[in-house]
Amino acid sequence: MSIFLKFFLYLFFITTLFSFEQGRVVNTEIIEYESLEQIQSNIINELGNVGIVSQYGATIYRILYETLDGYGDSTVASGVFAIPDSEQEAFGIVSWQHGTQIERQSAQSNRGFDILSRAVSSSGFIFVASDYIGLGISNDIHPYILKEPSASSVIDLIRAIRNYFDEDISICLNRQLFLIGYSEGGYVTLAAQEAMENDFEDEFEITISFPMAGPYDLSGTMVDKMLED
């Protein structure tokens, strides 16, 4: 982490110690922009001509936002969001929950575009992805397969994105919300879905949820396995 970023986070902590708000935007910055032609070329180079219909160039941003850590205390997490290059339409949100990562530096907020963020944003959706607590900018312990902090990192990022677009009238959101995750991200997706449906039903309306290949009952499965003859 750079000295400047450490200093910025320290100042932020001091000035907001008594004004914490889940989903508050701390900072945003552009990581990179790719034109429609660049996105099409990069997708073809990586996947071949698989029929992905790109319609827009896109810009991907790094975002810092307020959320809760594994102990229920306030903290700052990082993530990304990518915006289609158009001010004429209202776009839905696609929230991607990534699989298991073991290094903070491998977080998407340190990498910018990948094939999924290119495909989603160039097709006319707002792509968002949390690094999770303990990855990316966060120095906290990563709460691996813990329901509440996993859900909070996703829900508060979506809140932060909505807050950001509320202040930027050039970008409009529609009501569509897609949750997609694989491996650890499958678990995180289901945790976020459960919290949205049970605790925040007036705030979120999920269009479709795709939790894939997640360890949904890790403790229960391991207990049965360990007690086998």
Regions found by a protein language model. Name each.
Residues F20-E89:
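Catalytic-loop region of hydrolases
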Residues G70-S78, A82-A119, I137:
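Short, surface-exposed "cap/lid" segments of acyl-processing enzymes
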Residues I83-A90, A160-I180, F200-F204:
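Gly/Ser-rich "nucleophile elbow"/oxyanion-hole loop immediately N-terminal to the catalytic nucleophile
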Residues I93, S121-D131:
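A fold-wide structural signal in alpha/beta-hydrolase
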Residues G134-P143, F165:
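Glycine-rich "HGGG/HGxG" loop immediately N-terminal to the catalytic nucleophile
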Residues Y144-E167:
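Alpha/beta-hydrolase active-site loop
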Residues G181-G185, T189:
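Gly/Ala-rich beta-loop-alpha elbow adjacent to hydrolase catalytic centers
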Residues E197-D229:
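Alpha/beta-hydrolase-fold enzymes
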